[in-house]
Structures are given as C-alpha cells and as structure tokens.
Amino acid sequence: MKALWLVSFWPFGKSKINDFYQNLFVDSIKSLDFDITFSLTQFDEEKVKDFIDKKKINNNYVNIPKTELPSGKKYSNKLMLDNALKQFIDSNEFSYLVYSTADILVPNNLFSTLSKIKLDNFCALIYPNTHVTNGVIKNNYWPHFGIDLIVFKISREKALKFKEMI
C-alpha cells in the first residue's frame, strides 16, 4: 500500500521556528514504515523545492504563481486538492490520500493503526497529539482547535467521484 500526502510548506529561511517545525514534520514522515509520496502544491514559497530535494522525499511538485491566485490570497486549498486528486487518480497506485499541515508530528503508528480499520473506504479525522503556539508546547492532552490530519482510504473510482464534487 502507498499514500499520497497532500501538504504545502511555508517559505524556508524566513522564520527559524517555522523551519524547525517543518523539519520535524518531514522527519516524522520519513520515520514511518510506509511508502509515502508528497503531493506538493506551492505558491512561490521560497526554498521549498530545495528543502524537499535535500530531504530526499518522494514528491509530485507543482508551483502555481501567486499572480494566478485571486487578489489578496496567499494559497488555495482547492487547487492543492485538485492537484492531489489528479495525481492520485492518474497514478492508480495509492490506497490512501492524506492531508495535513506541515507543523505537526505524525505518530509513528499512524498506518499500523489505520490498517486495523477493515473498511474499503473511510475518512479519518485525526487531531494532533501536541499543540504548539509560537514555538511553545501548550499541552499534550487538551482538545485543540482544527483538524490537522485527514486520511482518506479510497479507491480510484471514489477519488474520481470526489474530484467531480469539488
């Protein structure tokens, strides 16, 4: 089984804190015992491609110039999802489509836990186990705002229907 991981990175070299947490995120992905390819849709963020190449992460990299976004927008989750679904459908080799932010630590048992779900198709909403605000760990157990990790286990056919809906 393989996973296509939809994520976008902030620019590198502008914030040591952001760089640190994005490095931790990638290292947590690399430590997983699972075949993962990043679906990266970037919007002119600096040094992202260099970072990914240096980290030797399998990836499908697409850059959309900020000039093609609506006025005042920095990114588009819709365009990111469009690109990821196209890659998922075209490759026909992925079992999971994962969305996350790039500032979380991914638990090393993620896919072993997901593999225990015996459904052919499902969506898992996973809350982070560590909440960090401005570089400070706030709490490991308190409920947090936002869903930072979403996992779809879907067939190519379901992905086609999903793409039609968005």
Q: What kind of region is each of these model predictions?
A:
Residues 37-42:
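Short internal beta-strands
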Residues 43-95:
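Active-site-proximal specificity loops/subdomain of glycosyltransferases
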Residues 94-107:
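Short beta-strand-to-loop acidic/aromatic patch adjacent to the donor-nucleotide binding site
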Residues 19-36:
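Short, acidic, metal-binding catalytic loop of nucleotide-sugar glycosyltransferases
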Residues 14-16, 44-51, 132-134:
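Short, charged/polar "capping" segments at the starts of alpha-helices
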Residues 77, 104-166:
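Conserved catalytic core of nucleotide-sugar-dependent glycosyltransferases
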Residues 1-24:
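N-proximal low-complexity "stem/linker" segments adjacent to membrane-targeting elements
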Residues 28, 50-51, 109-114:
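A short acidic, amphipathic alpha-helical/loop segment
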